[in-house]
Amino acid sequence: RSQSAPLPLLPTTLDPLPPWPSHPLLYPEFSTHCKDLIPLPSFYLPKIYSLLSPTPTDGVTESQFSTFAKTHLIWSLDEIYYNLTKSPSSPYLSPSSFRPILTSLLSHHPGLTFLSSHTDFQQKYIDTVIARIFYECDEEGLGYLTRRMCRKGKVWEAFEEVGREEDINKVLRFFSYEHFYVLYCRFWELDLNRDYKITKPDLLKYGDHSLSSLIVERIFERGRRFKVDGEPDEMCYEDFIFFMLSEENKQSHVAVKYWFEVLDGDGDGVLNTKDMKTFYNVQSHRMQCLGHEVVPFEDVLCQMYDLIKPRSEEGVVVEDFLQPECDKVSGALFDALFNLNKYLQFESRDPFLERTKREDEFDNDWDRYACLDYNRLAMEEEQREDDRNQMEEEQRE
């Protein structure tokens, strides 16, 4: 399990700087000399060097670094991260604020250097990390992050972790390469024309056609997006990440809010019986067409109300789903309304497998799904490689 440790406390006063060479330090010497003076991971050093040295060949003097330390390294650690990540001219963190830091991470982290010959994958990895950060932290869809939002989302704890952990796949929050690979491959499977956009017919194929046509319509109409100004009938890669993280981890508070907004067609903040029956009618029709026994809507509604105990007679509000006792059932309730395959799996679940799932190593459904799917993708790729090798051998013979 990946546990983000709390940010360490910094001393309230700066110790005297160690002896500084008489000449300005160019980046290689600067990074060696200053890596222990700056309380951030080494992949922040290129950004700091660029702030202090007007050009790559000017170098940094002792006076410049001393002034920088006295003005930038006296804050709390989360403030240091925030201020050194954002642009000096901006009061907030935008998606582009993270790009220089993540570009540096790609060249510094031992678990990512293999991507150096795959520029396209490097950029998609950066896109993925940024989208995951904003998915977790920018719940209001503002398009930027404040100090408070970063602190609440424990962004810098994840940066600390990726700075000290050599196995990138152990950093499950934001940075795991395996998680990126799963997200990107799932998008790639649906984006058949390779225009980096998903349409409604594309999304209907997700999860072996598990989603109803009505929920797909609503996802495009009301689903939270990374790009608020995107085309309404198209979903970019980052928008797809928002969808997929919500779909495969319905127990998370972020996903609950995502699906509640999608289901709440009139936007009044209440899911009433009419709202839910509209979705269930589509679901029950699909079950009938496939020969499955259909549970009456009234029985589903009664079960739902017994589990979440809504506080209002008018219907269910998002706070009802967010109660601690609803963490384990919210996903099943959503699936009953619009995901046929998962709903049928839930209805026929094996108690032994459910107990095994509760006792496994994963903290949430997304981590579990990503691990299993990555292993599946890796096995498929290995099989394709074996088939190619066999064909080459046969051709040589």
Which residue stretches match the model-derived regions?
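Conserved long hydrophobic alpha-helices within structured protein cores
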Residues: 92-107, 272-278
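Conserved beta-strand elements of beta-rich interaction domains across eukaryotes
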Residues: 30-32, 67, 98-100, 150-152, ...
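Intrinsically disordered, low-complexity regions enriched in proline, serine, glycine
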Residues: 43, 77-78, 94, 110-114, ...
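Primarily EF-hand calcium-binding motifs
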Residues: 5-69, 75-95, 100, 116-142, ...
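Extended repeat-based solenoid scaffolds, especially LRR ectodomains
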Residues: 145-150, 154-219, 225, 234-236
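Short, flexible helix-coil linker/hinge segments at the edges of structured domains or between repeats
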Residues: 98-123, 147-171
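Flexible helix-coil junctions and inter-repeat linker/turn elements that act as hinges
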Residues: 39-40, 107, 111, 138-139, ...
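Long, highly charged low-complexity segments
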Residues: 1-18, 181, 207-210, 215, ...
